[in-house]
Amino acid sequence: MSGERRKVRAVFGVAHIFASFNDTFVHVTDLSGKETSLVLTGGMKVKADRDEASPYAAMLAAQDVAQRCKELGITALHINVRATGGNKTKTPGPGAQSLRALARSGMRIGRIEDVTPIPTDSTRRKGGRRGRRL
């Protein structure tokens, strides 16, 4: 009997991680994406405005998300990572580290997908003809 393992069905949710350079949102929904379970941001976890987008704030938010998911009965997550996109940056900000915290906190990870909006033909980017001068 000790060699037998029971299969435990994983209850999946979807974690939408929006990592911009100003803040990080971790938004958990059901599989269809219609029903929101919970939303947490980096700004809810730290006091200083400059720390909202930091990896530390994102990891605190993700740990809290994992704990609340377990209370709701969600044991596994598919993850959608999103950057600002459009005619702005297509690389996720430092808050994408929240993914690592979700994995460490005991949540099973299903699929990881990049859902950054990428334009097929975009409007002109701000900054002028000669670009932003520092």
UniProtKB/Swiss-Prot annotation:
This is Small ribosomal subunit protein uS11. The keyword Nucleus does not apply. Residues 125-134 have a biased composition (Basic residues). The keyword Flavoprotein does not apply. Residues 115-134 are annotated as: Disordered. It comes from Syntrichia ruralis (Great hairy screw-moss). GO terms for molecular function: structural constituent of ribosome. Belongs to the universal ribosomal protein uS11 family.
